[in-house]
Amino acid sequence: MPQTALVLASTLGPGCSAQGRPGMGERGARGSEDLVFQDGRLVSGSLEALMEHLVPTADYYPDRTYIFTFLLSSRVFIRPHDLLARVGRICLEQRRQLEAGPEKAKLKCFSARVVQLLKEWTEAFPYDFQDETVMAELKAITHRVAQCDEEGGTVKKAIAQMTQSLPLALAARGQRQELRDKLCSPALDRGPVLKAKPPAAQKDILGVCCDPLVLAQQLTHIELERVGSIRPEDLMQILSHMDSRDKHRCRGDPAKTRSLEAYDDWFDCLSMLVATEVVKKKHRTRVLEFLIDVARECFNIGNFNSMMAIISGMNLSPVARLKKTWSKVKTAKFDVLEHHMDPSSNFCNYRTALQGAMQRSQTANSSREKVVIPVFNLFVKDMYFLHKIHTNHLPNGHVNFKKFWEISRQIHEFMAWTQVECPFEKDKKIQSYLLTAPVYSEEALFVASFESEGPENHMEKDSWKALRTTLLNRA
């Protein structure tokens, strides 16, 4: 996200630039007692002072990075619609002061800045405005600030543009959600009811695609489509779930976690699909080598999430125990992949590779070099670690805004990766197979695995015996 935007520069008039730096201008000076800065950067403050710092005046407009960070992090402490109501009251107070004071001429400039703030809010977090009561509050605020403008004036035009764009953004999100739900439902329901042995005519991955690069490209398509539906506030919702001591009311909103759960489920489905493809009777060695090549191509593309899912599928017990099969596989490539995903030293090797992909993306000469899809589970763990080692509040009661600057930076970085347009041609046939192909349940995976290579030790023999007994009793 750019440091500054002049989206409504034409509405502000001479001397009313939308630019501003954290802590600069009238608002920053007035709130200095409740706001703490280090090297010109806001690091803490009371929630009330932070809210006042968000609202522009006739002579002050907050930095855009502060707007994004505060709107994102404030939901840990206050619901968005409550924040909007508070912003409305502060704006009304400002307007009354301008009307009663000697600077009434600045009223239009102030109104334009308020609309600019609301516009940035609706663009960055349109989901905050899906409720009718919030929309009513938004209309009430804009109605009040627009009273100083003539009919057809710049402020009223900006308000009209904002109110027209917001429903479109909400509708687009709803359409993406419906599409994702259609794709997710079969994948989540298919596993437990499947038999161990597939019909002879059932397709397998090699029958659908025999080119590792093409399959890696289609996996990248699916990744970007799914991760692209995640919004910044969805990620912030993770923090609301983490702290069991936090009694904040908006925790657990299913609508704000559905995108995250769907993306997490995709990882599990891909891992199970990999395991299913391997334990099928025919061509196990060939399938393993093919999938290793697919994982390597994912790594080269920058699709680390699919790569990790493939490796995870190969490391599931029903696959990992197939010693005879693995003995025939040329594992040098797999060893390299496991080295990149080695969990030691906090996944140091993976983080080095991710940093390299990020640098490549920043200096990309082609769209193919821009792809960066991190391992989502590790990103969430990093967020969790950052959340746990830093408190939300300082001993003096101030919000620890330094913490939320860092959280916002990481979320913004993640969101930038999700907005990359997939540079590869879409193959509907391959994607359909990846998304809808039947996968084995955990029990079925073990049945197929033991039927391919019998149990080799007492523990495996006991497990196989118990599994057969369970299946016979169920039948």
Language model regions located:
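Eukaryotic small-GTPase/lipid signaling interfaces
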Residues: 1-475
